[in-house]
A protein has these predicted regions:
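Structured catalytic-domain cores with a bias toward divalent-metal coordination
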Residues: 1-318
């Protein structure tokens, strides 16, 4: 049985066999660390499935783990691999009670949304254990739930110095666009940057697909890029610097009276007109500023949650 099938049947599943040439141990349900006997690279964290309906990256990660167990992929760096929200993944739902990727600043015993808060705490503990091997690279792999003018892009939660070389890293994984955000976000990648000094990214790759449909061809570059990262190989030559955007502000829904004047199905990176009314939450109103583009518009979030992100292109590259 492959690792994904095993986890869907039982959260406490173990790897069917050890990864050759490595010491492997499970440090939380759906989370393993793999320590090669011969390590030539810095630590690497790969996480997928923080949202249970984003299955393409989950299947890519599962394929890589199965290839490592079969001796086809040879890890050459300390490697943590994690499947995020197993309960939601089984039900093909984004989350059960609360968006897991908004829970990584919650105290471990926060009230409400027990499933996601508890899972965030388990993932944070696993990351802290693995971080003892030193600083490295963290990639949290997602799919988009909407159309996008840039089908694949990365979000860097803090403009930290790069260890792997951002242009080569992004290009080798088929990601031509970088969004620079703040490290205070409650996301898994921001946790890695903020608490452990990882060079951390959230990858948004392709569109949501049903589990079992298999990764789409648009994820081939991701699969190949991750394979090279795990083997500590030099990233393949890229096509120059990524296009860079920077987060300018976020609009938070404060009450159920909130109205978003951007269509809920508006594509990511849709340019806005300066002065355009964006949202209302009486008595407050928000208007677009020069050069801003929309990212992740969602009026249906719970009060107190971000409803839209506004970004602006940056001249030059990373």
């Amino acid at each position: 049985m492959n690792i994904l099938s095993a986890l869907l049947a039982d959260s406490d599943a173990e790897l069917e066999r050890d990864i050759p040439g490595c010491r492997t141990r499970r440090i939380a349900p759906g989370v393993w660390e793999c320590l090669p006997e011969r390590s030539t690279g810095s630590p690497l964290v790969l996480c997928a499935g923080v949202h249970g309906d984003e299955t393409g990256p989950v299947e890519v990660l599962a394929e890589l783990i199965d290839a490592a167990c079969a001796g086809e992929l040879m890890p050459r760096r300390p490697w943590l691999f994690a499947f995020g929200n197993l309960a939601a993944l089984r039900l093909a739902r984004r989350y059960l009670e609360r968006d897991l990727n908004r829970c990584f600043r919650q105290p471990p015993h926060a009230s409400g949304a027990e499933i996601e808060v508890a899972r965030a705490h388990a993932l944070a503990q696993a990351l802290a254990i693995f971080a003892r091997h030193g600083k490295g690279l963290l990639l949290d792999l997602h799919s988009t739930i909407r159309a996008s003018r840039h089908p694949s892009f990365a979000i860097r939660p803090a403009p930290v110095p790069t260890a792997e070389g951002t242009p080569g890293l992004l290009a080798s994984c088929g990601v031509p666009v970088l969004v620079e955000a703040g490290a205070e976000a409650p996301t898994f990648s921001a946790l890695g940057a903020r608490e452990h000094g990882f060079e951390a990214y959230t990858f948004e790759l392709g569109r949501v697909r049903p589990l079992g449909a298999g990764p789409s061809e648009e994820l081939d570059a991701l699969r190949n890029g991750l394979w090279r990262l795990i083997e500590a190989a030099t990233p393949s030559a890229g096509a120059g610097l990524p296009r860079v955007y920077r987060v300018q502000r976020e609009i938070v829904k404060r009450s159920n009276a909130f109205v978003l004047h951007v269509a809920a199905d508006a594509p990511n990176f849709l340019p806005l007109q300066a002065g355009q009314l964006l949202a209302e939450d009486s008595p407050q109103r928000w208007f677009a500023e020069e050069g801003e583009c929309v990212l992740f518009p969602n009026p249906d979030v719970a009060p107190g949650t971000r409803a839209v992100v506004l970004v602006r292109p940056v001249e030059g590259g990373a």
